[in-house]
């Protein structure tokens, strides 16, 4: 998944500063917080299928479900996810001011910049290709690798740099066929689904390998050519599937428990939203033997 790669500090001083950045917000919660007047969500304003200023993303829809359950209106604090998102949203606080938002609706399990809830879905990277272009027999990643060598050698495979997809191409000797896309693009007008909606649909690339929710959503939006989504199994050296959860500030245990209660009580509604957006869901058994 493209946004779960995080770097650690390289020196003792930097490490101490980063730890302080994590611990200070938690310490600030020692006193009882004021009663909530809204469900305040931290979001990327242009990150479909997850979130947008129009409120038509997966996470927007789930936030509305939560707001209704809590009897609170939903408000959003928007900031591009690629630009120090947590520091500038969930953990952003000026002296004398309140935090601008209280929850991040989608973070990978293990993400250490927030206190992570229990997971609410697991998805995997997926391969997307147009029907009728000589790949219709491909139903799995293994099928793709078994295509005629001449066919494989002709394909332009779009992948985001530093993603599991680029690692997979390298492992299977297909680096030369890769068309790299930048994960960290500073242009806020660009969005992850462009690789499918603009380039794959227009024939600029022949295949795209992207995070499953992106694959499923944008493949459904394209009517011509018809696109096929093939979930990929993790294998030794390449982890494709990840559990997704929500994130709150460290130290806010009561709020975290309340969010986890909503995840449990609204499980059916969340599942329906994920299905509507075409998210490929997998469980822990969906992997190649000995993948780790």
Question: What positions do the PLM features span?
Answer:
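Acidic, polar ligand-binding/catalytic clefts
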Residues: 75-151, 231-239
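Periplasmic-binding protein-like
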Residues: 44-47, 122-126, 134, 220-263, ...
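Ligand-binding cleft/hinge of the Venus flytrap
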Residues: 63-73, 77, 141, 145-151, ...
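Boundary at the C-terminal end of the N-terminal hydrophobic targeting segment
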Residues: 28-30
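Bacterial N-terminal signal peptides
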Residues: 12-22
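Extracytoplasmic small-molecule ligand-binding "clamshell" domains
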Residues: 32-107, 111-112, 186-190, 276-277
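Extended ligand-binding regions for polar small-molecule ligands
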Residues: 57-70, 131-164, 236-281
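Alpha-to-beta junction loops
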Residues: 72-73, 91-106, 155, 196, ...
